[in-house]
Amino acid sequence: MLSISSVSNFRDVAIGPKMKKNLLFRCAKMSFLNTEDIMKIEKLNPYAIIDFRDPKEINKAPDNLSKKLLKKYISLPISASTLNRMVVQKKIEGDYKLTYEKVMEDSYKLYLNNHKHIWKEFINILLNSNSTPVIFHCSAGKDRTGIASYIIQKLL
């Protein structure tokens, strides 16, 4: 099992007997990746390192990748402001019955529906990886990365 301590939320996506372990990994931004962990990831030799953050997030905290790993880097931006815009719109519409669960459910639907081209490209990358590891992340490794994990787990 690959252990990366300098990146939050780094873990294998595999669940259950249908999924192979040590092929798909999710995590938070890789901005604080230390030398030891860079070497571990280089040894893993991933097919791709997919970043779901938008350009503003990337500029604020770029991934700390080696030259070798930068060659594997793919940006598939999904705006994190989707959730904030939705909350503001609900308040404008007078929907004061905002519950955390409802807001999250609606924002996840927007992440899926407004970025179908991104999800299609993500799946194509996975299909082309030929059982070579893939790492994917966003800022916290929760929402966009969680949706990506959910898609994979449902497809398998």
Specify the residue positions occupied by each region the protein language model found.
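Ser/Thr-glycine-rich phosphate-binding loops at phosphate-binding pockets of nucleotides
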Residues: 140, 144-145
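Cys-dependent protein tyrosine phosphatase-like superfamily
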Residues: 1-135, 147-156
